[in-house]
Amino acid sequence: MIEDEKAGLQPMDISDASVFFFQADVESKDFLTSLFDCEGKSDDRMLRYADAIIDVQNLNFDVSPQCLQSNIAEIITKFVLLSQDGSRRGLSRSFNFIDPDIIAGCREEDAIEFLLINFVRCHHELGKSGTSNCYKKTLESTRKAVFSVFVMIQRGYLESQLRSQHASLVFTKRLLEDTVSNVFLRTLVEYLASTDECDEDAITETFNPIFGILRSGIICQRFEDNKDEIVRQILRVMNLLLSIRLPSNGPRPLSNLLVNREDFLPTPSEKIQGREFGLMSFLGPFFSYGLESSARRPNHRVFVDCEEDARKYDGSVNTEQKLYFQRMDPIRTMLHQLMLPLASDQGSRNKTLRWIATIISTNDIRTRSHYDPSDVLCDHYMTNFLSVMYMFSEKIDLSKIIVDYPFLPSSLINISKETRLKMDESGAVAFASQFADRPDEYHFSTVCFFLTIAAQRLVIPPLMNQISEYSRHLKELKHKINALKEKLNTVSGFERAEVEKKLNYETEHWKLMSRHLLCVKTQAQDPALMASSMDFVDKQMKFILNLLCDNLDLLGDDSQLPTEVSQMFCALPEYFLEDALDFYIFAISNGMKLLMERNADWISRLTVLFTQYHYIKSPFLVSKLVRVLSSIQPPLWFNVVRLRMAQENLLMCMIKFYSDFEDNGDFYEKFNVRGNIQYMLEKMEEDMFYKGKFMDMARECGAEFIRFVNMVINDATWCIDESLSGLKSIHDVEKKMANKVEWDNTDQEIRNQDLGVYEEAKRKVKGWLGTAKSNLKLLLSITVNSPEPFRTPVLGERLAAMLNHNLSQLIGSKASELKVKDPRSYGWEPREFVSLLISIYLKLNMPAFVKYIAYDERTYSPEFFHNAIECMRKNSIVGFSQLESFEHLAEDVKKEYEAKAELEEEYDDVPEEFKDPIMDAIMVDPVKLPSGHVMDRAVIERHLLSTPNNPFNRAPLSHNELSPDSELKAKIQEWICQKRNSKK
């Protein structure tokens, strides 16, 4: 007391302190007694309440907080151990994975209920102002005691009286019902994470069983059962638990706990498959909720009576699909919310990224053309997975992406075996070696960006391939069903029963596969997924273009673009670009409305890339780029033709690539590429700038343009020949079938062979006739606007020969062999073909081309043209004015033909040294080859257009290596003059 006076403190009367502590004890005892209020309790439960109240009255509060907590915990433990099975809670929600018969009204429910209620009371009292320190100590000790008992129950320390498994089920159910306060959870986690309060295993043994119950719960849900509300509650609770942080923005203990579970990252063996890992891992079942279907086990419970919708190709969706979109959108958002704390917390981030990377690496066979679906995760799982990755990538700033990450030895994406944009395998290895010593740690944005690109590869292209494959399969099934229906009308008895059985089987198969296709389309056409894809792919393309040119200004000119691309760009995997192109191809057909609502910079980027297609090694990748551009329709097409950076090069690149693909690509893909370029040229005809540029190129007759026109002639020739040969085969078989008696008596094996030829011929005609027509129309367009290239012998002679040959086929002596029963089903309109040929003839009615027609020794003769004119007149194949113009052309050609005959007679003794060694005709412009051989320029240039080598030794040869033989040319001209003078 004296010391207090020296310190200047007012001395306290001992009696006042006694009163203070007495009042605090009373307040504490009253509060603790209220926890065990027995009012309204049944007689059989009264005893334990009374015992607890007596224990409270005997408590000594003048002890340390730890001792007080222990004493209160002992009272609570004693009380809850006497819990009894009671009545079930009213209005309790039902969850199909928690058996109500096990936990409803059980002792554990009573105990948990008691603890939760009393925590709330403690928290409420602590929130009051003016609380004395002594009373506050009691409240805090009581709260910790509640946690202590709760944890003991959950850990199984009281297993003989209170079963931990039942307690976990009860608590999980309360979490799902949202009847556990967030404060309780947060404070409980803080208590468990405190080394002063609990051992390191406490949090694991308390919450791991709860995580296990939630995981089991999600496994029990089936999309077709429409239990979305349960799924949403499970995901909500998972997010709630994982998001709990320690004070002062500390770590998330439960996120760390989850990623350290053994089943979070099951150790993948060398043989582990994607499906096995995806479903074994803890998070797997959460991503597995959705519209499940496979070709082996089609989902027969969905899209019933909607099978015809599978045949639609316009991107439209039916009501049932829209319903599935609405159901999955909130669930995918909640999946992202579940993953967000795992990816955000420093302690759990690395393992979470490793889980994502392992899902990708173990399912990488989804990128193959053919794979066993049982080895990989299903489409709905991967679509959910990709949706989450897209959400992670929404806020990524490209300026913060470390571009060298994919090349690091420790990178989570493995690109070592990937084909590069413009680098061979050894170059890629050498390029990656420079990053061997880079640090392993990279920020989340970088890793997430590249993982999303890798994940996208496993989803978008496979879905597109499946839609294409199953659509084709359904089309074949429909043809088969129609054929069986026709056959059903012609058979009877046992054979009819067999046909009916087969028809029923094929019809049922068609229905199942239609439903499966609708399931696949539903995954791919989800508008939320497509919108996210558009945003990410736009970011992806911007990233690729940035490697070409930093801060590329799409409104500027092409001077920004480098002559040589960076090594980083060259080393990028092809799929970085290819997957973006695949998505745009799909989006143009199925999400045009979404594309129209977005910035059109993506079109500008693709156009720029095509005008510099030499940056890309693979012609197939460039062909896919062409396919995207050709698919763009007005008004978006305006962004292609009006891009300042591309205006100078776009047309030339189209023409050049048209020819370049000849030797680099697949035979059939060649026609696809050229068809796409032809379609782009058609659209450009409406643009005066490009129309004028095309005419200028034609007038210049540069090497690339000559090469381009030659390819058009080649393709037209081949496609027409294939189509006409197919029509002849159809005609021959139909002729046999028309004689029913003879056909019925024909050996079955021979009939089957003929029918095989018949079907193959029909496919061939349908496949090539449209391409033939397109090439003829392109030739006509060139002749209308720019006939100059056909003045040159190298092209004029080839086109004249092609026109003559095909005209003779169509209206010559064997034209009747092209008549078939149903020509329109193949797109076969012979009058239209003849009209196209005549139009090309007439547009090239100039002296040089007239000469080329007359000099065609293979087909032309005056009688041939005369007969053709009579046939067209008799059958009114072309209009009167066209026919009249063609008659005038025929007269001019006849005169040139007669003049040629005179020259041949005049030059019948041409010296051998003046003759072209291949054509055996007098040379007009002799040139020397590097091998020393001499040829006529027109002949060797025509040869080089299709085969760039020396015809005598097969050595590579180009136009630039041809040197004029002026001396020989002078001798030939002198000889010709002498012959003419001698004739006079």
Curated annotation (Swiss-Prot):
CDD domains: RING-Ubox_UBE4B (cd16658). Disruption phenotype: Number of germline apoptotic corpses is decreased in response to ionizing radiation-mediated DNA damage but not following UV-induced DNA damage. Delay in the dissociation of rad-51 from DNA damage foci. In a hecd-1 (tm2371) mutant background, the decrease in the number of germline apoptotic corpses is more severe. In an atx-3 (gk193) mutant background, prevents the increase in the number of germline apoptotic corpses. RNAi-mediated knockdown in an unc-45 (m94) mutant background restores motility. GO terms for cellular component: cytoplasm; nuclear membrane; nucleolus; nucleus; ubiquitin ligase complex. It comes from the Eukaryota. InterPro entries: Ub_conjug_fac_E4_core (IPR019474), UBE4 (IPR045132), Ubox_domain (IPR003613), Znf_RING/FYVE/PHD (IPR013083). It is a peripheral membrane protein. Residues 909-982 form the U-box domain. It is found in: Cytoplasm; Nucleus membrane; Nucleus, Nucleolus. Pathway: Protein modification; protein ubiquitination. SUPFAM superfamilies: RING/U-box (SSF57850). Changing C448Y: Loss of interaction with cdc-48.1. Constitutive localization to foci. Decrease in the number of apoptotic corpses in the germline in response to ionizing radiation-mediated DNA damage. No defect in catalytic activity. Expressed in the germline (at protein level). Pfam families: U-box, Ufd2P_core. PROSITE patterns: U_BOX. The keyword Lyase does not apply. GO terms for molecular function: protein-folding chaperone binding; ubiquitin protein ligase binding; ubiquitin-ubiquitin ligase activity. Keywords: Cytoplasm, Membrane, Nucleus, Transferase, Ubl conjugation pathway. Gene3D superfamilies: Zinc/RING finger domain, C3HC4 (zinc finger). GO terms for biological process: ERAD pathway; positive regulation of proteasomal ubiquitin-dependent protein catabolic process; protein autoubiquitination; protein K29-linked ubiquitination; protein K48-linked ubiquitination; protein polyubiquitination; protein ubiquitination; ubiquitin-dependent protein catabolic process. SMART domains: Ubox. Its EC number is 2.3.2.27. Belongs to the ubiquitin conjugation factor E4 family. PANTHER family: UBIQUITIN CONJUGATION FACTOR E4 B, UBIQUITINATION FACTOR E4. The U-box domain is required for the ubiquitin protein ligase activity. Forms a complex composed of deubiquitinating enzyme atx-3, E4 ubiquitin-protein ligase ufd-2 and cdc-48.1; within the complex interacts with atx-3 and cdc-48.1 (via DDDLYN motif). Forms a complex composed of cdc-48.1, myosin chaperone unc-45, ubiquitin-protein ligases ufd-2 and chn-1; the complex targets myosin chaperone unc-45 for proteasomal degradation; within the complex interacts with cdc-48.1 (via DDDLYN motif), chn-1 and unc-45. This is Ubiquitin conjugation factor E4 ufd-2. It comes from Caenorhabditis elegans.
